[in-house]
Structures are given as structure tokens and as C-alpha cells.
Amino acid sequence: MAREYPLEKTRNIGIMAHIDAGKTTTTERILFYTGRVHRMGEVHDGNATMDWMIQEQERGITITSAATTCFWRNHRINIIDTPGHVDFTVEVERSLRVLDGAVAVFCSVGGVEPQSETVWRQADKYGVPRIAYINKMDRVGADFFRGVRMIAERLGANPVPIQLPIGAEDSFQGMVDLINMKAIYYTDELGTTLDEEPIPAEMEDLVQEYREKLLEAVAESDEELMIKYLEGEELTPEEIKAGIRKATIAVKMVPVLCGSSFKNKGVQPLLDAIVDFLPAPTDVPAIQGVDPETGDEDERHSSDNEPFAALAFKIMADPYVGKLTFFRVYSGTLKSGSYVYNSTKGRRERIGRILRMHANHREEIDEAYAGDIAAAVGLKETTTGDTLCDEQHPIVLEAMEFPEPVISVAIEPKTKADQEKMSIALQKLAEEDPTFRMYTDQETGQTIISGMGELHLEIIVDRLLREFKVGAKVGRPQVAYKETIRRPVKAEGKFIRQTGGHGQYGHVIIEIEPQEPGKGYEFVNKIVGGVIPKEYIPAVDAGIQEAMANGVLAGYPVVDVRATLVDGSYHEVDSSEMAFKIAGSLAFKDAAKKAQPVLLEPVMRVEVVVPDEYMGDVIGDLNSRRGRVEGMEPRAGAQVIRAHVPLAEMFGYATDLRSRTQGRGTYVMQFDHYEEVPKNIAEEIISKRQGA
């Protein structure tokens, strides 16, 4: 079957935003106007098409990014709806990795909120071209221009409005199109009929000022346009659009539009902007990768004629078809029923069926082409971030990095019968979500689950009950402490056993030293002259890592250490991998005790929005939680307090803040960094752990 839409007419985009900016509503309206949905879904009613997991409909937030295909002006648009809640940054990170462009939705009242900053930084990391859509122009306190200013100041971007709102709050009627210089009014309830009229007289000066800014930005993107502009010639709408497209794709400019998705105003021009300004797969650079056989760098261009290469970016358990693997095809084509090579795992797998997803219904397709986003049924071994490719031309695409979980809870099944079901279910959930981990605590035998925040773990427990019918009891949340060392130390590990026949002999001398925070573990082998045979070196490394899983202070994992194997000895007969593994482990434990071990705790970036009269009280409370207040700023009749607070002090904060501010305060927090726990508190934690 030939491809329906040429690559140039394909757009792979994400819709990203803060939690309440109206992202899901905007996506719903896009699906309505592009004809995929016959009745608009409302998040308020809990029936939005994209939010198809039951938990999402109840909570009114988007948790998993559903991929949907729709059509506008003879273009195919694949949309990935991403969650805006900080506990789900992994979903955002995954979807940005496979997108070519994005629409950032902002609330006209809140402007740039903390989650918008996080998502924006993630998009910067992957160099994703963006257009901004300032939504909720009908709300009290709507301020388009403040939104634009905040995009520049807080995100360090170059926002250039290509529309200006006509009116605001309840008098918001439409917008001025600065490219074609006309006013657009919405006349019917559903927003399907647009009236074009001359620009209102009272807006002429403002329009002129912003038209000038737009022309300047466009001229800067292209030398020919710059010459034309400087010579005072009029630029045609086509030239302006071409200039905006060029600057947007080069991530030198962010075109800004406005609207009110809920009131059905502004969505069609947004669709036009997606088609006009966001890149096709052919506009973005070739995807980089590595040839797994030679280790050489390699790349794949967006073309059906190159060897097949795709990235699996999401795994979902589907009640009807089993495991669904969402993937983005970067090059080549893939037929259903064919075999692919998973180069990350070095395994060959068979693709059963290929599905194109529309929020929660699906159509089966025979073949996926370069630039497509689709879901495969039948891949057993593939997990998030794996590369699928042609076995004759293997390539490993750069995988994604996911943040470490910061919060853990002990979980136990309500009945004996649930025990086995629970571990299978948790295993499946961990496959879907790389920021969710499960392990068994060696000392207590409890099952511990860890994730990115309280909401994240709540939803996991909720899914256990609904999808897997496993009842579970959850303990109190625990902080994921870590340990590290503060000074370099040399130590020796000897494991010698003489029993009848073969004995055991392993002897190593290692040096350990602190690495800078976040650098992780590094093993360096400096053995020369074969004092320890080559085949035993990996065993020493494994032994050290095993010892690092349980630190010397309180049994927490040790991080940011470089271990160097400098010397040792072996025995012709008695040495074995096992003996060297134990020697490595003993050496590390001994070294860590002498290397000034310290306890680290996760510190969160917290942003609290409260009415003025509660500000003093809330700041006092943050200080009492060992918080450092970094700054404050007024926002729409309230105060925004930014602070860094240890996670250990933030449990139950939501309830506390509600009672302190009579339900008027809100807050968001996300992981920022690890830092050393103050001595007196560290002693308490250690004695509790040892007492347990």
C-alpha cells in the first residue's frame, strides 16, 4: 500500500503545558475541528477523548500521552497529548524525544508556571521548535501581553506575537491576524464560522507596533527578506510565513497565538500555524545513532528508502490486545507480520499487527512509513527507549534518560492470594514507566515501590486495583535517601578460605574518591602486569557495586563515587570470580567507613501561590520545614513564593496549606537536587534505621 500523505505533509507534534492551562481541551477542539470527533469532549464532564484512562477522567488530568492522528488542510497531524503534572515528567520527556515540533499552551492568567518551565527546558534539551498558544483569554485577569513578557523573561525565549486578542475576559471576541492584517471574529457558539473584518480603529496603533516587531523578526531570519525590509518594500503574507517558518524551525523564534479553547475561539488559526510553521520530518536534522557492531557514529534520514529505524517511546498494557508498543519511525518502512531487530537488547522480534491510534479507538494498518507514529502488537522484549531496526543495517538511536525516583512506599497485598498477582502487576507497570521502580527490602522482606511523587504512587496503587484487581495496603511514604563520601581513601579487601580441596582466594586494593554530584559511579582499572588476571576485573567491579547498594551509614544506596582498582594478588588454583567479587565488596565497605560517609536527601523546588494576607504565615511554615525561600513575586492578586525544601519535610503539605489558607493556597513541587542532610537530622535517621 503506497503512502497516503507525503512526508512534507506530515506533522508530529506534542501539546505541552502546565497542569491547568487547558491542554486537553485544546486537543479536544483540534480533534473536533479536524473532524475526528463528532461531539466535543469536556474535561469538566470527564469525557474528553484523549483522557481515556478511568483515573484521568475522575481527576481531570492527563496521565499517559495518547497518540492521535488527525487531518487539516491535506496534512496529517500526529498529536501526542502530554501530561502537565510534575509527577509525570517522564511522559513528557518520552514524547518530546519523538516529536518534531510542539505547541506550548499557557494560561493567560497564570502565564509561565513552574511546570511550564520544566517542560520548556526539556524541549530545549531536544531542540524542539515550538509555537505558543495563550489560552483562556475569556478568564477574569486574562493578560496576553504579560504572558508574552513571561515567555521572554522566564523561559529566555524569543516570543513574537502573530495575533493580538480583541478584548479580554468576558469581552474577548476574536483576534487580529498580524500576517494578513485583518480581524477575525467568532460568531457562532461552536466557533465554526469565522468573520473577517477590518481591524478595529482603537487597536490600530497597537497593531502597527506589533506588526513592526513581527516584520523585524522575520527579516532577521532571511537575508533576502532583510534587504527587502530595509529598503522599505512591503513583504507579502507568503514571504512573512516563510520567514516565520524558517526562524521557528531554527528555534530562533516562538510565534505566539491566543484564544479560548473552551469557548471555541482560536483553534483553527492554531491548526493553520501547526501546518504553516512547525517542521515536517524532512525539516529536522537526521537522527543520530551508533552502529552496535563497530561503535561508529551513524545516522538515518527521514526517508522511506533508507534502512528501517524506529524508537519505542511508550509501552502500554491494553485490555484487548495485550502489550502495545508505541514507536516513531525515523527511516524506512515496516510491514505488519515482519521481523525487526531490537538493537538495544540484541534480539529479533516479530511485529504482529500495526495500529494507528486515535485517543481510544484504533485502526489497523498494513505498513508504517518514515515519519509515522504507530503502535505495534506482539513485541515481547521491547521496552521504553529501545531501538527497532533492520537486522542487516543495525543502529542504536540515542536512548532517553529518566530521572531517579525520589519517594518510596512499602506495599503489601491485602490477601495471600493477591501476593503473586501483585508482583506480576507491578512488573507490568514498571515496564510501562521507567520512573517507577519496585524492589524487595532485604532487611524487612517488604515490597517497596518508588516513583516521582505522591500522586504518581497513588495512581499506581489505583491501577493495581482497577486493572489487575489486586487489593493492596500502602505504608507511609518514605524518602529515597542516598549516601556518598567526602574524601579519598585507599583500602584493601582480602577473601581467603582454606577448606579441603579447592580454597578461595581474592585480594584487591582499591582507591575510592568522591565525584561531583550527579556524576554517578565510575570504575577505573589500573592493574598492570597481570597482578590480577583480566577475567576477574569485572567481578571486582560487580562486588563494589553490590556493596554500594547498601551504604555503611544506614543501608541507603551510595552514589557519586569513583573506584579505582590499583593492586592486588591472586592464586593460581584458588582464585575465582566469586572470590574477587567478595574481595571487591569487602574493600569498598572498609574504604567507605573511612571516607567520611554522609547522608544525602532529595530537595524539592516548591512554588506556593497564596493570597497576600497568608504570605507571612506560609513563609514562616516553609522556614520551619528547613526550607530556603528563594524569592517572591506578585501574580494576579496573589503572591508566588519560590523555595527549596527537603522532601522529608513536605509530606502532608497539601492538607496543611489548605487549612492555613482556608483552601485558597495552591502549590506545586518537583525534584531539584540531592544535598547533604544536616548532622543532627542525619543522626536521627541513622539511629532509626539501625533501631528498626
From Swiss-Prot:
Compartments, record wording: Cytoplasm
Lineage: superkingdom: Bacteria
Record keywords: Cytoplasm, Elongation factor, GTP-binding, Nucleotide-binding, Protein biosynthesis
GO cellular component: cytoplasm
KW Protein biosynthesis (keyword) present: yes
Nucleotide-binding is among the record's keywords: yes
Molecular function (Gene Ontology), one example: translation elongation factor activity
Alphabetical GO biological process terms: ribosome disassembly
Sites where the protein binds GTP: 17-24, 81-85, 135-138
Pfam families associated with the record: EFG_C, EFG_III, EFG_IV, GTP_EFTU, GTP_EFTU_D2
Domain tr-type G: 8-282
Major place of residence: cytoplasm
InterPro entries: EFG_II, EFG_III, EFG_III/V, EFG_IV, EFG_V, EFG_V-like, EFTu-like_2, G_TR_CS
Similarity field: Belongs to the TRAFAC class translation factor GTPase superfamily. Classic translation factor GTPase family. EF-G/EF-2 subfamily.
Functional summary from the UniProt entry: Catalyzes the GTP-dependent ribosomal translocation step during translation elongation. During this step, the ribosome changes from the pre-translocational (PRE) to the post-translocational (POST) state as the newly formed A-site-bound peptidyl-tRNA and P-site-bound deacylated tRNA move to the P and E sites, respectively. Catalyzes the coordinated movement of the two tRNA molecules, the mRNA and conformational changes in the ribosome.
Record-given protein name: Elongation factor G
Gene: fusA
